[in-house]
Amino acid sequence: MTLTITAQTISITSIEQLNELSGENVKLCMQCATCTGMCPMTAEMDLSPRMVMHLAQFGMLDRLGDSNTCWKCASCHACTVKCPRGIDIAKVMEALRQHVLRTNKNYIEPSALPAERIAELPQIALVAAFRKLTS
């Protein structure tokens, strides 16, 4: 992926918003990629956790919002446990999900699910999915 960074693409406001939502300082990331190596979901993501942190450092939240990565994150905290800088990357992913949902963009429509599928799924899974994927 080619990424061009200019003074116009860097959004200080977006960086501050992400830091506030997550309670983390994304600028502390040194791009070691330990998070990517530890993540069990990396193969399913279109951007690696390291790339998410890289884009977050420039405040490119719109680009991150178009990615499936924050939705594929299992919030298992494997990345957080091994991060040499102590960044809770799972919190950053949750903050990205919250940012996207605040724009009223849903990733799942409850009424579109077939009734037989709803009947066979555990209720806790449905609640978790709706909480995570709808605004």
Residue ranges and their predicted role:
Residues 81-97, 128-135:
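A broadly tuned preference for mixed-charge, low-complexity surface segments
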Residues 25-42, 67-87:
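Cysteine-centered iron-sulfur cluster-binding motifs in ferredoxin-type domains/subunits
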Residues 4-21, 44-70, 76, 89-121:
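Ferredoxin-type iron-sulfur electron-transfer modules in oxidoreductases and energy-metabolism complexes
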Residues 113-135:
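Acidic/histidine-enriched, glycine/proline-rich intrinsically disordered or flexible terminal extensions
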